Curated annotation (Swiss-Prot):
Protein's name according to its UniProt entry: Chorismate synthase
Subunit structure: Homotetramer.
Lineage of source species: Bacteria, Pseudomonadati, Pseudomonadota, Betaproteobacteria, Burkholderiales
EC identifiers of the protein: 4.2.3.5
GO BP annotations listed: amino acid biosynthetic process; aromatic amino acid family biosynthetic process; chorismate biosynthetic process
Binding-site positions, FMN: 125-127, 238-239, 278, 293-297, 319
PROSITE patterns referenced in this protein's UniProt entry, alphabetically: CHORISMATE_SYNTHASE_1, CHORISMATE_SYNTHASE_2, CHORISMATE_SYNTHASE_3
Annotated source species: Burkholderia ambifaria (strain ATCC BAA-244 / DSM 16087 / CCUG 44356 / LMG 19182 / AMMD)
CDD domains linked: Chorismate_synthase (cd07304)
Length: 366
């Protein structure tokens, strides 16, 4: 298995399995001289960790991070930063019924056919448990981007199943377990999830992420375009089945006179492009949306096959998120931050001294 590293100059290599002794990552390429403590990382991990409400998995993991290397006297040294998170609440016996069968919609079948072996305990390497190290690495990236460029990366849930969540204010997001930007709709979301849980079923969600303060110029055309790398990173998140940047699929029905964001001396008139043109950041907000499929592990019996190819019925009994999208906001934020820091360093390496006579216009003319 070789696809375990994200990035070019700022790289993150994750390791571990859902029911192994620990999970973690090694970050390489972090600039030296940045203050960094475990508390900086723990704040983000606490936003993602399981067991925080009745609407997510009841697996109780503290997700306490340990910095093993790359930091001396509270400052990054420029050497690899190793982060470790110990697993403490595994219940592997819950998965005894799928040792010989494959869960529909999961990676069980494909991992088995590719590698000839699979860790059936909680999905092993394919588990969303492995997003915790990504969030840990994302905390490092967020801190550097904020301190070096004033970049802020924030996200929220914009849709839960059939329930749209209209944006009201960023301050609402941190006040509820759904990362909803609309406090008034939270009771409806809770009732929706309660009914879903009684049905033994699951549902998907849409998450929107915004990066503000990104300067013009980040991105490496043609094959490492900023939007291409963002899409790849987002599609690397468990259960993500779609990515939109800017207007996304709505662009299909827009005319060029509408979609093309006009430029004025005062700034851009619109942002249908989502802050990226030609694979390079424009200086506007970078806007990304992801579609997350329903959790595949549900209590409703489903048809499947055994390793021998015989018919079987699968019912999952482990502790699972009825909607993985509820905890996905910090993960999507982290993925965007990791792509941005990598491109910031790549831009600095090749084009850091480039200057033009054209003034950099504002992201918005209003």
């Amino acid at each position: 298995m070789s696809g375990n590293t994200l990035g070019t100059l700022f790289t993150v290599t994750t390791f571990g399995e859902s029911h192994g002794p620990a999970i973690g990552c090694v970050i390489d390429g972090c600039p030296p001289g940045m203050g960094l403590t475990e508390a900086d990382i723990q704040f983000e991990l606490d936003r993602r960790k399981p067991g925080t409400s009745r609407h997510v998995t009841q697996r109780q993991e503290a997700d306490e991070v340990e910095i093993l290397s790359g930091v001396f006297e509270g400052v990054t040294t420029g050497t690899p930063i190793a982060l470790l998170i110990r697993n403490t609440d595994q219940r592997s016996k819950d998965y005894g019924n799928i040792v010989e069968t494959f869960r529909p919609g999961h990676a069980d079948y494909t991992y088995w056919q590719k590698y000839g072996i699979r860790d059936y305990r909680g999905g092993g390497r394919s588990s969303a448990r492995l997003t915790a190290p990504i969030v840990g690495a994302g905390a490092v990236a967020k801190k550097w981007l904020r301190e070096r460029f004033g970049v802020e990366v924030r996200g929220y849930m914009s849709c839960l199943g059939e329930v749209d969540v209209p944006f009201v204010d960023w301050s609402h997001v941190r006040e509820n377990p759904f990362f909803s930007p609309n406090a008034a709709i939270v009771p409806e979301l809770e009732a929706y999830m309660d009914a879903l849980r009684k049905d033994g079923d699951s549902i998907g969600a849409r998450i929107d992420v915004v990066a503000s303060g990104v300067p013009v110029g980040w991105g490496e055309p043609v094959f490492d375009r900023l939007d291409a790398d963002i899409a790849k990173a987002m599609m690397s998140i468990n259960a993500v089945k779609g990515v939109e940047i800017g207007a996304g699929f709505d662009s299909v029905a827009q005319r060029g006179s509408v979609h093309g964001d006009e430029l004025t001396p005062a700034g851009f008139v619109g942002n249908h492009a989502g802050g990226v043109l030609g694979g390079i950041s424009t200086g506007q907000d970078i806007t990304v949306s992801i579609a997350i499929k329903p959790t595949s592990s549900i209590r409703t019996p489903r048809r499947s096959i055994t390793k021998a190819g015989e018919e079987a019925t699968v019912e999952t009994f482990g502790r699972h998120d009825p909607c993985v999208g509820i905890r996905a906001t910090p993960i999507a934020e982290s993925m965007l931050a990791l792509v941005l820091i990598d491109h910031a360093l790549r831009h600095r390496a090749q084009c850091g001294d480039v200057e033009t006579s054209t003034p950099k216009i504002a992201g918005s003319a209003t």
